[in-house]
Amino acid sequence: EAISYNDYINLIEKTVEELKSDSDTQKIVISRIKELDKHDIDLSETFKNLHQHYPNAYVYLRYDVEEGCWIGASPELLLKEENQLIQTVSLAGTKAKEDDWTDKEYHEQQVVTDYITATLSGFTNYIDVDGPFSVNAGFFEHLKSFISAQLIDKDKLYDVLKALHPTPAVGGMPKDLAKDFIIKNEGYNRT
């Protein structure tokens, strides 16, 4: 269920308080639902516009009887595999285009990169990290590193996927503490 703008601001303030507290939580990524009347939006036109404005993103349109319609554009590749070579990205740190990168954004990006490489280390022979690079995301920019690794056992690909998801870029860090906070406070089910 969608929450009001003021409730979302309150959630942001609560999240900041949690991060400043003695909690071990290092990062929490909150979100909210924006509900639109189905008559307010042309899905095919929106889908085309997302492709046009975010050419490097994974653009999706999904409909589920219970959950309704979800449409969006994600710049984050979770996992790709070909001949046991797996690829993913570490995407974190966001700023307005006109701003300069700060240590805060580089730290956020490194937390995600470290998490991904540590997770992959148990499944792979080697890991290569290229980046971070600044990437365009509409009105914003993100820091992105490309990560590739040689999978030891192709039968473990689904295990790798389960271990990676959700990355700290979409949930937080440590995963269990961030997930608990999100479940208790966001007011909707992200799955």
Which positions does each model-derived feature cover?
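Contiguous alpha-helical scaffold segments within structured protein domains
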Residues: 1-6, 10-13, 87-184
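Terminal domain-start leader segments
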Residues: 2-43
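Short, well-ordered alpha-helical packing segments
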Residues: 16, 47-51, 117
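Conserved hydrophobic/aromatic pocket- or pore-lining residues that grip, position, or stack substrates
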Residues: 23, 79, 114
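Short coil/turn segments at secondary-structure boundaries
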Residues: 26-31, 61-64, 131, 158, ...
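An anion-binding catalytic pocket shared by soluble metabolic enzymes
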Residues: 32, 37-111, 144
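Short, intrinsically disordered, charge-balanced linker/junction segments flanking boundaries
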Residues: 186-191
